[in-house]
Amino acid sequence: MAMAGAAGRCLMLTRPSPLLRLRLLRAALATTTTTTTAAGASAVTAPTEPETTAREAPSRHELLLERLRQRHLKGVPAATPRPAQREKGRGGGGGGAQELQQKRRVEVVDSFEELGLGEEVMAALGEMGISKPTEIQCVGVPAVLAGTSVVLGSHTGSGKTLAYLLPLVQLLRRDEAMLGMSMKPRRPRAVVLCPTRELTEQVFRVAKSISHHARFRSTMVSGGSRIRPQEDSLNMPVDMVVGTPGRILDHIKDGNMVYGDIKYLVLDEADTMFDQGFGPDIRKFLAPLKNRAAKPGDQGFQTVLVTATMTKAVQKLIDEEFEGIVHLRTTTFQKRVATARHDFIKLSGSENKLEALLQVLEPSLAKGNKVMVFCNTLNSSRAVDHFLTENQISTVNYHGEVPAEERVENLNKFRNEEGDCPTLVCTDLAARGLDLDVDHVIMFDFPSNSIDYLHRTGRTARMGAKGKVTSLVAKKDVTLATRIEEAMKKNESLEALTTNNVRRAAVNPQYTSTKGRPSALKVVNQKGRRGVALQTKSSRIVKDTTSSRRRSPIRSQPRSKSTSSGKAKPVRSAKPSKSSSPSPKVAKSRPRPEGRKGDALNKLGSKLSVVGFRGRSSGKSAQAS
């Protein structure tokens, strides 16, 4: 023990100086460099100790892999980026996201042949004049051909119908060649469910155009049509049935259609069907197929869901109903379309909203554009249609009270290239599932949520075409419009604005209650100030320079008498205001009739200011466009 202590003291006394330690470190580094160079030349030398200690200690698994490489892969240099790969794996998925983006960029191809489609389908595409696939088609076609149950999510007008119909037709032809399956009466192999009759007709029309070359038979069964012709069509050999859930269930109940051979199921506009009460019908249709869903190979069936929007509630419902389904989304899902311009017109409330609509609509019609005017209610739609008819503007209607056959006729008139009825006045019934060539979408009534906004704007700028969206923003809609504009400027998804069914009352609290104001919006105090200043850090909804706020206390004076007896001062202050300077303006504003066009347009010419997120502002843009 004494000798050990003496040796320890000797070592402490003979500790090397800092200069000596620096020399030893340089010698060690030189040895490391020499050993590494020799290892690169011979490719069999093991890593030196300094190299091993310079990085993290290798695991036992890595050492075994290195020994196997040295034994069986002589002459192959060791993979240098291994430490970086290990760090990437420990980093929490940052590298995985980059790899996914790179893979998605590689999947976007320039021709349909690279997607694995056959000659018959390619001939049908050539007849339709389509040569280059869209992003959703590049993502969806290979997935459906591989037999995967998927949810295809992409913005409206991106080609989702062809994204599932093209591979579906090829799968039907493959089953005929490999499994000997053929057409049978009342036993379709593919079923496409759609929420509306109009979307059913659209999908059926595309399927018919493909069937001219692919040689398969499809039929359409939808509500609002006679049942007898549909029964006769189902009693003939059929491959695919396109229809609405309720009518298909009726035919199954009556024995006109059976489940036996169904292998492929498509739910078009799936978010609409789950969000608008089609859930029970879909569950009833899926009940006999649940047992077959878990069977492997050709005994099961494949499900494809197509949607333009997806709230978290609907996504959760889909994941519960379809276990193991894969979600495939494009980069533009639930975002603005790059080829569409969005303008917002702030209305203070004193203007005539119908006259503002006329001022926006007339220049667009003068350019030969086809325009859709969206309203929130039937009464609003009737009022707009009556007003435009009085001003010699030809219109057609599309809402719930218009009979189904008349709606089809109105759509044909609107599609007519001669332009006899270039204006379609409609409700949200026309916001989904209609493939129309629309140049301009005007929102007379601003929607109550961003999902409806996306569907309305999806009627224009379809398949890469240019379009324009103009929104008349009332005071109660300012906050939601501001948030939508901010999200579009940042190219963010609009789904977050409708989480848990957010409506205007929840998004816009400063108009339902005078207490408190939102942090995202700076509203000028309502006590007698002249203008409404609507400013955010990124929003460009324009200031309204009217003097409506100056007149608002006088209009609300009778309310002060009835609501509170102690507020006699506002009533007395109204008497001297008759002789004050603002009185002539008040007198001019009250007798102004709403039906007159002359004075209203002169005043609106200085009030309407259009601001789009591309930076084009001022009233000139409203007149120029």
From Swiss-Prot:
Annotated motif Q motif, positions: 110-138
SUPFAM superfamilies the UniProt entry points to: P-loop containing nucleoside triphosphate hydrolases (SSF52540)
Span list, region Disordered: 36-59, 72-103, 505-625
Record-annotated Helicase C-terminal domain positions: 353-503
Top enzyme category: hydrolase
Motif (DEAD box): 268-271
CDD domains tied to this protein: DEADc, SF2_C_DEAD
UniProt keyword Chloroplast present: no
Top-level division of the source organism's lineage: Eukaryota
Binding positions for ATP per the UniProt entry: S154, H155, T156, G157, S158, G159, K160, T161
Intrachain S-S bonds: none
Record's catalysed reaction(s): ATP + H2O = ADP + phosphate + H(+)
Domain Helicase ATP-binding: 141-328
UniProt entry tagged with the keyword Hydrolase: yes
Biased composition annotated in UniProt, kind: Low complexity: 36-51, 567-586
Keywords tagged on the record: ATP-binding, Helicase, Hydrolase, Nucleotide-binding, RNA-binding
The protein's name in its UniProt record: DEAD-box ATP-dependent RNA helicase 39
